[in-house]
Amino acid sequence: MALWGGRFSQAADARFKSFNDSLRFDYRLAEQDITGSVAWSKALVSVGILTQDEQLTIEAALNDLKLAVLENPEQILQSDAEDIHSWVETQLIAKVGDLGKKLHTGRSRNDQVATDLKLWCKQQGQQLLMQLDKTQQQLVSLAREHQHTVLPGYTHLQRAQPVTFSHWCLAYVEMLERDFSRLTDCLKRLDTCPLGSGALAGTAYPMDRTELAHSLGFGSATLNSLDSVSDRDHVMELMCTASMSMIHLSRLAEDLIFYNSGESNFIELADAVTSGSSLMPQKKNPDALELIRGKTGRVFGSLSAMLMTLKALPLAYNKDMQEDKEGLFDALDTWSDCLEMAAMSLVGMKINEARTKEAALGGYSNATELADYLVAKGVPFRDSHHIVGEAVVAAIAKGVPLEALTLAEFKAFDVLIEDDVYHHLSLDETLAKRKALGGVSPVQVEFALTNAEKRLEERDTSGISIRAARLTDLDDIERMVNYWANIGENLPRSRSDLVKAVGTFAVTEKHNQVTGCASIYVYDTGLAELRSLGIEPGYQGGGQGKAVVEYMLRKAEQMAIQKVFVLTRVPEFFMKLGFRSTSKSMLPEKVLKDCDMCPRQHACDEVALEFKLNVVGQTINLKAEKLAS
């Protein structure tokens, strides 16, 4: 179904339709389009276009559609709809009839697609932050393991000065830290909601756009409707951030490819990230790393194409802007894949420590130490540089390292050189001297490594925040509780019950959108029950359940409660958090009365578990406390 047919007297040519349609790639925005449509339906209630009952009908149908899409997104591609917006509207009308035709009131596909794309960028950006963090974690772990492994440092691909493998790892940790910072800043800048901007002049319906923005998890609404539908800065900025990061990943890949070569023989990559040759049986090729290096140009190309698309483009929406998605999707998918492969390539990598040390000792990499030695004796550096250059030439002619020259041979270059020169030329001393911040001395490497470990430990990449529930959260809580009750995982709870109990609830938020809940009920005996744990469908598996349970346990501990129990059909989840089996006979009588509301009361398959607070061996993850702050 086209959304614009009334103006036309004949159908579009099939070839034009194929050229014009975007469903084959913008189907990836289905979840975001449905989420935005639910929020828009609520805004239409506030301006009298929809009744409360109509909105609830539309929301229920859209939520059912979202679940179907999450289970099988490829089903969308079986449609001949023009784009994802047409597909969602067609599906909604099929479910609720003419009521679905009201949904697009006051909305344009211009502000709709801008909102969908920003929602997708926020979600994808959060995943990329987690992947950057994971790659950094792997580098730091490798750095700790090989803190004292010596490695030759290179300039111009010639041995220059000795470093450590740990120092090399930490160099890339810093590069990825800048990528993390850039992506974080980018996500802050795109945290504005265009919905309600209409085609270009704004919606004709006086809704609260700030409230609408907050309901979708945005920090604020955009401030100019014309800019809102024209803006694709966030697309370019994300691609630019991806391009910068791919440069870093490509350099890391190139280093490791060189270290892995037979000529270097510093490392051996794991079988899991290498492949063989169809002709040469002995080959073990670093394909994962070579593909990272090769795919870097692909990301650059997407950025270049987007810059050219937007150059000199008039304001408001132009069909050229349909070209924003394929390049963005591909660039961020590629970046994500390369981050995953980079982290995988670091796992199981073997370091040939004997070979790296041998290489670090070669190439006259201690020549700078001899120059510094002469400077300490009062020789100007430029003169000492020249003297050492002559000494290196003599050592090369003799076929020996610098430290193998005799004292008499050294004195031929400068009489100030004494027996202590050999100590200064040793590998350990060469490393130990680099004590300034950021240097390669063991002290500085330990300092940098400890700081990196602390920084990563304290960082929260989950995108989850937890807080006490408010009355304004009731719609979300009721929806989640009763969704899981309908499929038999929770006890059903009425609206009036939830209103009375809202003070016992906590909610989780992702991108300022409520996506999880749980409550705690305290009995006269001082025993507490964890109740109504629910996560928004489609958001499971992201750590929210664990986070909200830990938050509730912390709350119980602050109330001096000594034991929290739960009745559950998924005991494995709670046992991973420290809960232990207990007998239902030990539970308060009121719990058994509540079972009367359960549809499975005559064939109960719930397991009783308990968590004893302030008991050795059962501790609460303090991260829940951090998330709440």
UniProtKB/Swiss-Prot annotation:
A single cellular component GO annotation: cytosol
GO biological process, any: arginine biosynthetic process via ornithine
Main localisation: cytoplasm
Protein's cellular compartments: Cytoplasm
Gene3D superfamilies named in the record: 3.40.630.30, Fumarase/aspartase (C-terminal domain), Fumarase/aspartase (Central domain), Fumarase/aspartase (N-terminal domain)
Domain N-acetyltransferase: from-to ranges: 464-598
Catalytic activity, reaction form: 2-(N(omega)-L-arginino)succinate = fumarate + L-arginine; L-glutamate + acetyl-CoA = N-acetyl-L-glutamate + CoA + H(+)
Span list, region Argininosuccinate lyase: 1-499
GO molecular function: argininosuccinate lyase activity; L-glutamate N-acetyltransferase activity
Matching InterPro entries: Acyl_CoA_acyltransferase, Arg_succ_lyase_C, Argininosuccinate_lyase, ASAL_AGS_AcTrfase, Fumarase/histidase_N, Fumarate_lyase_CS, Fumarate_lyase_fam, Fumarate_lyase_N
Keyword vocabulary terms for this entry: Acyltransferase, Amino-acid biosynthesis, Arginine biosynthesis, Cytoplasm, Lyase, Multifunctional enzyme, Transferase
EC number, UniProt record: 4.3.2.1, 2.3.1.1
Pathway membership, UniProt: Amino-acid biosynthesis; L-arginine biosynthesis; N(2)-acetyl-L-ornithine from L-glutamate: step 1/4; Amino-acid biosynthesis; L-arginine biosynthesis; L-arginine from L-ornithine and carbamoyl phosphate: step 3/3
Residue numbers spanned by region Amino-acid acetyltransferase: 500-629
Misc note: In bacteria which possess the bifunctional enzyme ornithine acetyltransferase/N-acetylglutamate synthase (ArgJ), ArgA fulfills an anaplerotic role.
Stated family: In the N-terminal section; belongs to the lyase 1 family. Argininosuccinate lyase subfamily.
NCBIfam families assigned to the protein according to its UniProt record, in alphabetical order: argH, PRK12308.1
Name of protein: Bifunctional protein ArgHA
